Amino acid sequence: MVGNTFGRIFRVTTCGESYAGAFRKNLQIPKELFGGLIAIVDGVPPGIKLTADFVQEELDKRRPGKTPLDTPRKERDKVYIFSGVMEDDITTGAPVGMIIPNDVIEDEHINKHKSYKEVVRPGQAGYTFFKKYGQFADNIGAGRASGRETAARVAAGAVAKAVLDTMGIDVIAFVTEIHGIKAQENITYEMAKANYRKNEINCPDLEKAKEMIEELKRIKEEGDSVGGVVEIIARGVPAGLGEPVFDKLQATLAHALMSIGAIKGIEFGEGFGHTKLKGSESNDVPYYDEASGRVRFKTNRAGGILGGISNGEDIRIRVAVKPTPTISIPQKTVNMYTLENVEVEFNTRNDPSICPRIYPVCEAMVRIALLDALYIAKGYRAISSNIDPRWDRL
């Protein structure tokens, strides 16, 4: 398996499976080493304050079992930093290594997954994993295709956050739609910050959030699931990040976000709305702002990126999140060993929607991508000393 690393200078590598301990419990090793998720973060500068509590705060946002709308599966997602940080919680410049042990290694939930190992679960990666890895694929809890894999990303994203915080760059994500119930349009950064995590689904529109929550309760009773939309805003990103051809900033961010299993669509700024506008309406008008001493834009339909390069305005992204594929309603599928068409009812613990737990994963991946782009941009400018310095002020 390849493709477990993201980034060029600020590089994140993850490994581990959802329920690795289920295989290793009979080995003569301590229970703590049965299995878990690991994140290795390379390119972390020295001198950054980084505590396990700081990383844990991010992990707790996506941890299951916190509310009645979550899967009831209990995982502490407790993180341990085992390298790259000294006793004073200051980074050394060496790779930061983190492990999140699997608490749940043998229970009814895992046993049910084992009983389904021969069949393809609709909407999941079972069939494609069979085609690519055959009988050797980890088929308990979807292995590397499991949503639990994202816990390692969130841990790595917390490291990126610790660095970005020193630069005044903030990334915030929130739910704007659940199963067709939409929050108000154009939620501002200020509104999102003021109402951040004020309800179980992290929707800044507090009134619409009530409708969304009731819908999720109804869907959960049915044993079904629904999708939705998550929006991400990055504030404080300087102009100049990204490359103009194959490595456009929006391409890097799309790579980061579309690598999350449940994400099925993405748009920046006005996105598909540009198809309904004239050029005179679509264009963001630039002007010199004396108060800030730099060029600003009267609107932000571009979503903070022009020509593949950040323009200094808020970067705004929306992603489409598909329904949780594992549901309790009987579904038709295929037994890959007998090649029989069968019907299976997946009575395992699942979320009625992934949206309330995926937003911290979106935050993490955007932070990782932005910090990597920032490193590249700063390195490029450092060796381009013949560029007129006045442009740096704008």
From Swiss-Prot:
Cofactor: binding details: Reduced FMN (FMNH(2)).
Keyword Amino-acid biosynthesis: yes
Entry binding sites for FMN: 144-146, 307, 322-326, 349
Molecular functions per Gene Ontology: chorismate synthase activity; FMN binding
One GO cellular component term noted in the UniProt record for this chain: cytosol
Domain of life according to the entry: Bacteria
Xref: Pfam families: Chorismate_synt
Leading EC class: lyase
Positions of disulphide bridges: none
Reaction(s) catalysed by this chain's protein: 5-O-(1-carboxyvinyl)-3-phosphoshikimate = chorismate + phosphate
Keyword set, alphabetical order: Amino-acid biosynthesis, Aromatic amino acid biosynthesis, FAD, Flavoprotein, FMN, Lyase, NADP
Cofactor(s) the protein requires to work: FMNH2
Pathway: Metabolic intermediate biosynthesis; chorismate biosynthesis; chorismate from D-erythrose 4-phosphate and phosphoenolpyruvate: step 7/7
List of residues binding NADP(+): 62
Keyword Ligase: no
Single GO biological process annotation from the record: chorismate biosynthetic process
Enzyme nomenclature, EC number: 4.2.3.5
Subunit structure: Homotetramer.
Function: This reaction introduces a second double bond into the aromatic ring system.
HAMAP family: Chorismate_synth
Record family assignment: Belongs to the chorismate synthase family.
Protein name, entry field: Chorismate synthase
Gene: aroC
